[in-house]
């Protein structure tokens, strides 16, 4: 998810590292961009904001945006996906599972300079059956992110624990809810170094249906999720940086399409998925007394993969592409193994 919109222009521009010769001309350019729709913005004017901010300001903005994407949204989306893909038959058994997901991303915006990010997320979970209609579970998430900013670098380490419950209203409909909390440790490296910590909370509600037509399975789902990342204050060289808390409300809609067939004792289930995330939330970064705003962006995600079931073991492999207004390349791949008992 992208966290900065082209039409959102910061209240002021930090020029501590790069001083244009004519400040009046710069402010006129920024004002002109704010009054024009995206399609009408000249490329040279749209680039003025990103080019004008200092290295420290650019790094703080980029880190805030990357944290919103990977911490608030990726973790919640992966949990929603796990809950949605649990079948009614799974509710009659207990299971343990582990998944590993790799993300590769490139970001660009008129308010921060282009950067790339690599992230690895590992999740360990347990699902327990309480009755033929009720299932509960717990998920522990650990992720490590490496960012390459313009003349700077960043690193995030994130740990979060979630609990969920899923109730089947009948053979098709289900409702599920989850809640979790976590901790984010961050490091920024320009010519100076800064270390700081933030906390996270998440909660979500999902409603879905499983339609079975012979060997075909169609699983539509919809939900709402609230995610919050706390504020942070830190020093980056001579600059005092204040990052406001970021709260994101997400409306989700997803559709999974699968076909199940057998090859001997092995069950094969190819799977295609599409999901839409409507994200609402704004945050801010203050560097040296000058404020810059950013906001959550809507996303679409498309996935393809397959599940292999042999006795009580399931292996899932899938790849995804995520699109948004300012997402250049967003690709991920996941492998997941589950054991039922």
Write out the residue ranges for each language-model feature.
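Membrane translocator/pore-forming domains, dominated by Gram-negative outer-membrane beta-barrels
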Residues: 43, 51, 55, 93-95, ...
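Outer-membrane translocation/initiation segment of Type V secreted surface proteins
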Residues: 1-124, 132
């Amino acid at each position: 998810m992208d966290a900065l919109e082209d039409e959102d222009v910061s209240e002021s521009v930090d020029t501590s590292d790069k001083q244009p010769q004519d400040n009046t001309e710069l402010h006129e350019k920024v004002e002109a961009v704010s009054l024009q729709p995206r399609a009408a913005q000249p490329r040279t004017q749209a680039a003025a904001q990103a080019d004008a901010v200092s290295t420290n300001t650019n790094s703080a903005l980029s880190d805030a945006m990357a944290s919103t994407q990977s911490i608030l949204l990726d973790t919640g989306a992966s949990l929603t996906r796990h809950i949605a893909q649990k079948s009614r038959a799974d509710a009659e058994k207990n299971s343990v599972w582990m998944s590993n997901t790799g993300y590769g991303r490139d970001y660009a915006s008129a308010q921060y300079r282009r950067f790339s990010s690599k992230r690895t997320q590992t999740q360990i979970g347990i699902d327990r059956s309480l009755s033929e209609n009720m299932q509960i579970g717990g998920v522990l998430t650990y992720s490590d992110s490496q960012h390459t900013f313009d003349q700077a670098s960043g690193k995030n380490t994130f740990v979060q624990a979630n609990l969920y419950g899923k109730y089947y209203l009948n053979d098709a409909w289900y409702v599920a809810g989850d809640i979790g909390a976590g901790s984010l440790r961050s490091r920024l490296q320009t010519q100076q170094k800064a270390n700081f910590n933030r906390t996270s909370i998440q909660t979500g509600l999902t409603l879905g249906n499983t339609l079975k037509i012979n060997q075909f399975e169609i699983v539509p789902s919809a939900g709402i999720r609230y995610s919050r990342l706390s504020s942070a204050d830190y020093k980056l060289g001579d600059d005092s940086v204040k990052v406001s808390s970021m709260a994101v409300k997400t409306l989700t809609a997803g559709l999974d399409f699968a076909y199940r067939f057998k090859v001997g004792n092995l069950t094969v289930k190819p799977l295609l998925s599409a999901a839409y995330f409507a994200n609402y939330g704004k945050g801010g970064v203050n560097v040296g007394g000058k404020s810059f705003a950013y906001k959550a962006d809507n996303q679409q995600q498309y996935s393809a993969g397959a599940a292999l079931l042999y006795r009580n073991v399931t292996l899932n492999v899938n790849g995804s592409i995520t699109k948004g207004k300012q997402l250049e390349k967003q690709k991920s791949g996941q492998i997941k193994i589950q054991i039922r008992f």
